[in-house]
C-alpha cells in the first residue's frame, strides 16, 4: 500500500530509514453511522504517518472494544472484523514508534479501566519529554503492568487513576502535567475527546458530519469520510463530544509552535495546515530554492514522490524543463519479511531506477526534500552518472537537518546527521554532487505563510520550544528499562489473568482472539 505522497527518499535505503512521523490519529462520534468503517477509511488516509501498527477502539455505550495489531491498516482489518466493531463512537491509530519498541503491547489505542467501571481508550500522535518523570511519580509497576512501554500507555493510566472524577475532569487535571508534543483522541463508553498540547506542535483538526463529528491528524482524513472542516483543535484545548453536543475547555494558555517539517514532508500534499495548502507551500519552497540556488541545467527531476512539488516549483521559477528521471517501485519496503543480504546489497536499486533515455547526456537538477545521513543521495548521484548524466546538481527543499526531534518525528541521532559534522561543501563532496543547495530557513518559513514565532524549527536551528530533560531521561526507549525490571521481578507478568488483574481489565483484555466479541469490553489482536 504505497503512501499517497511518497516516502522520504532516505527510506529508499532499506538499512537506514529516514525521519518518520509518530502516528496518525482519528476519532468519530456519529450515532447511526458505521463508525468503525469511517475510522478505517480515516486511518487509510493517514497511513503515511505510521506503518508499524494499526488499531481501532469502538463503543456502543455499554462497553469499549479495542482491536489492534502490527501491520498496515489494510493488513490488520478485514470486512468481518469491521462489521463486528459496532457502536456510535470510535477512535483509531496508525503507529510509527517514537517511544517504546514496535510490539503488539505498544500498539494503540491503549485501554484502561477505572475502579468505578469506566473504560478509557486513547491514541496519541506526538512525544512526551517528561515521560520518565511521570512514570516515577505514578509508580513503575502500575505503569508497566500491561506490558506496554510507551508514553501513551502512561497517559491512559494517569487518566484512569482518578475514579472519583469524570474522564473530562480527570483530563483537565492530567493534561497540564504533560510536557512535550501531543495530539490525543480518546474515549469512554459514550464520549469522544480530543486534546492538543499548548504549543500545537502536531496537527489536529475538527470536522463535521451530517450526524456527528470527526477529529483527525490531517484534513485529508476528513475529506475521505465526507466531513467538512470546521477548524483546528486549538493548542491547549480539550474537546468533548457526546449526546449533549460539543464542549470546549482550556487546560493551558496557547503558545503556538507548529512543526515546520510537516510542510516539508510529513503531511500529505492535499492537507491544509493553519490555512495553508501543503502542496502549494512545497511548490513555493521550490520556487524559492531556484531563486537562491540557480544553475545552468537541462532538466529538473524530483526524487519521487516527496520531492515532486518542490521540483515543479523549481522548474517553473528557473525556466528549466521539468521531467521524470527516476522511476520508483512502490511495492518495495512494505513488508515485515526481512530482506536477504543480497537484497540489502542492492539497496536503493530495489526502489529507484533511472530513465536512461531521459537523463543521458543531460545536466540534471535533482530536487529532494531533505538530507539526513546522505546515503540515498550518494547512491542517486552515482546511479544517474552511471546512466549517462553529464552533471548532477542536488537541490534540497529544506535547510540542513542538524538536530534531532524530540516531539514526534523519529530522526536519526545527532551523531548520525550528516549536517552535524560537515558543512555544505563537505556534504557536497560526500554525496558526489557537482553542486549542492539548500533552501534557506527564512525562505522555507516564508513559504508556509506562518510567522517564524509560531513554528517549531528545532531540527534546523536547535531552538527547542519545550525544555528538554537530561539525555538519560529522554529518548525512544526511555521506558524500556522499566519494563525489563518489572518483568524480571514478576516472571508470570504476561499471563492473561495476572495482566488483567494488574491493569484493571477483565481476563479477556489480553486475549489473542481472531475477532473481537462486541459483548465484552476487550482488547484483541489478530
Question: What positions do the PLM features span?
Answer:
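Generic beta-strand/beta-sheet core signal
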Residues: 123, 187, 195-196, 207, ...
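Short, glycine/charge-rich flexible loops or terminal/linker lids adjacent to PRPP-binding catalytic cores
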Residues: 319-364, 375, 402-412
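Conserved short alpha-helical segments that host acidic/polar catalytic motifs at enzyme active sites
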Residues: 2-235, 240-297, 303, 391
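A conserved beta-strand->alpha-helix junction
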Residues: 148-149, 153-156, 322-333, 430-448
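Flexible loop/turn segments at secondary-structure boundaries
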Residues: 35, 98-99, 130, 201-202, ...
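Secondary-structure transition/capping motifs at alpha-helix termini
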Residues: 144, 164-165, 292-298, 316-323, ...
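Phosphate/diphosphate-binding loops
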Residues: 173, 221, 228, 236-237, ...
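PRPP-dependent phosphoribosyltransferase catalytic core
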Residues: 175, 190-191, 226-232, 252, ...
Amino acid at each position: 500500500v504505497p503512501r499517497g505522497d511518497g516516502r522520504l527518499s532516505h527510506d529508499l535505503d532499506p538499512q537506514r530509514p529516514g525521519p518518520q512521523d509518530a502516528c496518525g490519529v482519528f476519532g468519530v462520534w456519529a450515532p447511526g453511522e458505521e463508525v468503525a468503517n469511517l475510522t478505517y477509511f480515516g486511518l487509510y488516509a493517514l497511513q503515511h504517518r505510521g506503518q508499524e501498527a494499526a488499531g481501532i477502539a469502538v463503543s456502543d455505550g455499554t462497553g469499549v472494544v479495542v482491536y489492534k495489531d502490527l501491520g498496515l491498516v489494510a493488513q490488520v482489518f478485514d470486512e468481518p472484523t469491521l462489521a463486528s466493531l459496532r457502536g456510535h463512537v470510535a477512535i483509531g491509530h496508525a503507529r510509527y514508534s517514537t517511544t517504546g519498541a514496535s510490539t503488539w503491547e505498544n500498539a494503540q489505542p491503549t485501554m484502561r479501566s477505572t475502579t468505578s467501571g469506566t473504560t478509557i481508550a486513547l491514541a496519541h500522535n506526538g512525544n512526551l519529554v517528561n515521560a520518565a518523570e511521570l512514570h516515577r511519580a505514578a509508580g513503575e509497576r502500575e505503569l508497566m503492568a500491561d506490558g506496554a512501554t510507551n508514553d501513551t500507555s502512561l497517559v491512559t493510566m494517569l487518566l484512569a487513576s482518578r475514579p472519583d472524577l469524570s474522564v473530562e475532569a480527570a483530563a483537565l487535571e492530567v493534561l497540564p502535567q504533560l510536557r512535550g508534543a501531543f495530539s490525543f483522541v480518546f474515549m469512554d463508553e459514550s464520549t469522544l475527546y480530543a486534546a492538543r498540547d499548548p504549543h500545537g506542535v502536531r496537527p489536529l483538526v475538527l470536522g463535521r458530519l451530517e450526524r456527528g463529528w470527526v477529529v483527525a491528524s490531517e484534513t485529508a482524513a476528513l475529506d475521505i469520510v465526507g466531513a467538512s472542516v470546521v477548524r483546528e483543535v486549538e493548542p491547549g484545548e480539550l474537546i468533548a463530544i457526546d449526546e449533549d453536543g460539543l464542549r470546549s475547555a482550556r487546560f493551558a494558555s496557547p503558545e503556538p509552535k507548529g512543526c515546520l517539517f510537516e510542510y516539508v514532508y510529513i503531511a500529505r500534499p492535499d492537507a491544509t495546515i493553519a490555512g495553508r495548502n501543503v502542496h502549494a507551500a512545497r511548490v513555493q519552497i521550490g520556487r524559492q530554492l531556484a531563486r537562491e540556488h540557480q544553475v545552468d541545467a537541462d532538466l529538473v527531476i524530483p526524487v519521487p514522490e516527496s520531492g515532486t512539488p518542490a521540483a515543479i516549483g523549481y522548474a517553473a521559477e528557473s525556466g528549466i524543463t521539468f521531467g521524470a528521471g527516476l522511476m520508483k517501485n512502490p511495492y518495495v519496503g512494505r513488508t515485515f519479511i526481512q530482506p536477504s543480504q543480497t537484497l540489502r546489497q542492492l539497496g536503493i536499486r530495489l526502489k529507484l531506477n533511472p530513465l536512461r533515455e531521459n537523463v543521458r547526456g543531460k545536466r540534471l537538477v535533482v530536487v529532494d526534500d531533505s538530507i539526513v545521513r546522505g546515503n540515498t543521495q550518494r547512491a542517486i548521484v552515482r546511479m544517474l552518472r552511471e546512466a549517462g548524466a553529464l552533471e548532477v546538481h542536488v537541490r534540497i527543499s529544506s535547510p540542513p537537518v542538524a538536530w534531532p526531534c524530540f516531539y514526534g518525528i523519529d530522526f536519526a541521532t545527532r551523531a548520525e546527521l550528516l549536517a552535524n559534522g560537515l558543512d555544505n561543501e563537505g556534504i557536497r563532496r560526500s554525496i558526489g554532487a557537482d553542486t549542492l543547495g539548500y533552501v534557506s530557513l527564512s525562505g522555507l518559513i516564508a513559504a508556509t505563510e506562518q510567522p517564524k514565532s509560531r513554528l517549531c524549527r528545532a531540527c534546523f536551528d536547535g531552538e527547542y520550544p519545550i525544555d528538554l530533560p537530561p539525555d538519560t531521561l529522554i529518548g525512544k526507549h526511555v521506558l524500556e528499562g522499566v519494563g525489563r525490571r518489572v518483568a524480571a521481578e514478576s516472571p508470570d507478568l504476561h499471563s492473561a489473568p495476572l495482566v488483567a488483574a494488574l491493569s484493571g481489565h477483565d481476563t479477556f483484555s489480553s486475549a489473542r482472539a481472531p475477532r473481537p466479541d462486541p459483548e465484552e469490553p476487550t482488547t484483541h489482536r489478530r
